[in-house]
Amino acid sequence: MPLSAQQLAAQKNLSYVLAEKLAQRILKGEYEPGTILPGEIELGEQFGVSRTAVREAVKTLTAKGMVLPRPRIGTRVMPQSNWNFLDQELLTWWMTEENFHQVIDHFLVMRICLEPQACLLAATVGTAEQKAHLNTLMAEMAALKENFRRERWIEVDMAWHEHIYEMSANPFLTSFASLFHSVYHTYFTSITSDTVIKLDLHQAIVDAIIQSDGDAAFKACQALLRSPDK
């Protein structure tokens, strides 16, 4: 008898929850690379789900490069080099409280490689309208120094950085900012206390971009990223 739409949705939800649980165990090293996962029946009994839900969960992890199912062998955990850490779900599963500092360390390396280049491009190819909007965001950041609101600062700070990526007109850089939106938010939330952060360094980037000085924008961004707390 065919499953109803509601039953299919419930099954899909169960398979996603199972995929997350299995991914967490793999990320924590409970299932090490090279090992074979328990079979469908064992996993189904262990987590209280159907074999269909297990199969769907395995498909999800396979698509992320975490496992590789093989007939008569089983589902093998793949080396970490195969895992697609640019996958939004995998990134979310990885960024637990336990792994937070590890994720942020890797994230900051990516930022210092990419964000200065985004600033350079923003200065050289950004439109007058985009530069005006960047200046508007900067003005609000400056205003928050006098009347600080933590949540609003985080929102504006994120919008400021993401707008620079958009100004670069480079689809890969724009996608990076979009993909790592949740990481940016978590990171900015963790470093923001009760005051604005490095306002002068943000302003130096804006000044360089508005003046269409790509080299100065590049160096100003490096200064921001290498300064403490940012």
Swiss-Prot record:
A GO term, aspect molecular function: DNA binding
InterPro entries found in the cross-reference section: GntR_C, TF_FadR/GntR_C, Tscrpt_reg_HTH_GntR, WH-like_DNA-bd_sf, WH_DNA-bd_sf
Record GO cellular component, one term: cytosol
UniProt entry tagged with the keyword ATP-binding: no
Entry keyword annotation includes Transferase: no
DNA-binding region listed in the record: 40-59
Keywords, alphabetical: DNA-binding, Transcription, Transcription regulation
Residues that span the membrane, as ranges: none
Positions of the HTH gntR-type domain: 12-80
PANTHER family linked to this entry: GNTR FAMILY REGULATORY PROTEIN, TRANSCRIPTIONAL REGULATOR, GNTR FAMILY
Protein name as catalogued: Uncharacterized HTH-type transcriptional regulator YieP
Source species of the chain: Escherichia coli (strain K12)
